[in-house]
């Protein structure tokens, strides 16, 4: 994707801030449903990072697999849990929380120190991808689509039916 410099920079800053806010939401929100939705925001932002580098198939696969399957499964599992179990004997601050905060703060400080001490001027930033690589990516994703819709159509549909039956079975077992 050939974007002008300021738009490309704005997109990266926007997606990076979405990643940071979503990650903080996963860690800091006490309601597990809200944490799962924040994890979905993180997955969406990660998949959107692939679009400026002309990896559209990877972005679509990331959205389908992580947001469409894994995050929905996490939300599904959290919704079937008893919400009152989370709030019984809720201590405001424990020793484990203190140790975790010290470890995370030290990792964060070392990361910031590394970022500030790195010479970023020697890194070559590329904004346009090579046309040969772009053509290979397009042909590979087209080949995957052709194989899924012709050679592997029956196994692909059988797997989707098996997953649907497993999901219906899980719902039936959870309701009993």
Swiss-Prot record:
Major site of localization recorded for this protein: plastid
Listed under catalytic activity are: a plastoquinone + NADH + (n+1) H(+)(in) = a plastoquinol + NAD(+) + n H(+)(out); a plastoquinone + NADPH + (n+1) H(+)(in) = a plastoquinol + NADP(+) + n H(+)(out)
Instruction: State the annotated membrane topology for this chain.
Output: Multi-pass membrane protein
Per its UniProt record, what Gene3D superfamilies does this chain match?
NADH-ubiquinone/plastoquinone oxidoreductase chain 6, subunit NuoJ
List the transmembrane segments.
Answer: 10-30, 32-52, 61-81, 93-115, 152-172
Database matches in Pfam families: Oxidored_q3
Q: Which domain of life is it from?
A: Eukaryota
A GO cellular component entry from the record: chloroplast thylakoid membrane
UniProt KW Cell membrane keyword: no
Q: Which residues form a coiled coil?
A: none
Which top class of enzyme applies to this chain? translocase
Compartments, record wording: Plastid, Chloroplast thylakoid membrane
Enzyme Commission code(s) on record: 7.1.1.-
Q: Which UniProt keywords apply?
A: Chloroplast, Membrane, NAD, NADP, Plastid, Plastoquinone, Quinone, Thylakoid, Translocase, Transmembrane, Transmembrane helix, Transport
Keyword Cytoplasm in the entry? The reply is no
Gene Ontology MF, one: quinone binding
Family to which this protein belongs:
Belongs to the complex I subunit 6 family.
What is known about what this protein does? Answer: NDH shuttles electrons from NAD(P)H:plastoquinone, via FMN and iron-sulfur (Fe-S) centers, to quinones in the photosynthetic chain and possibly in a chloroplast respiratory chain. The immediate electron acceptor for the enzyme in this species is believed to be plastoquinone. Couples the redox reaction to proton translocation, and thus conserves the redox energy in a proton gradient.
Q: How does it assemble?
A: NDH is composed of at least 16 different subunits, 5 of which are encoded in the nucleus.
Name assigned to this protein: NAD(P)H-quinone oxidoreductase subunit 6, chloroplastic
User: Which organism is this entry from?
Assistant: Vitis vinifera (Grape)
């Amino acid at each position: 994707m050939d974007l002008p410099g300021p738009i490309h920079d704005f997109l990266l800053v926007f997606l990076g801030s979405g990643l940071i806010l979503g990650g903080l939401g996963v860690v800091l929100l006490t309601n597990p449903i809200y944490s799962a939705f924040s994890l979905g925001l993180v997955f969406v932002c990660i998949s959107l990072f692939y679009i400026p580098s002309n990896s559209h198939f990877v972005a679509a696969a990331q959205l389908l697999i992580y947001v469409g399957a894994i995050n929905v499964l996490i939300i599904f599992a959290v919704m079937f849990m008893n919400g009152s179990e989370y709030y019984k004997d809720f201590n405001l601050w424990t020793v484990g929380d203190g140790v975790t905060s010290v470890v995370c703060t030290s990792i964060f400080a070392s990361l910031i120190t590394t970022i500030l001490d790195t010479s970023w001027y020697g890194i070559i930033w590329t904004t346009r991808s090579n046309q040969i690589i772009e053509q290979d990516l397009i042909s590979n994703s087209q080949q995957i689509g052709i194989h899924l819709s012709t050679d592997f159509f029956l196994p692909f549909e059988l797997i989707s039916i098996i997953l649907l039956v497993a999901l219906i079975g899980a719902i039936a077992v959870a309701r009993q």
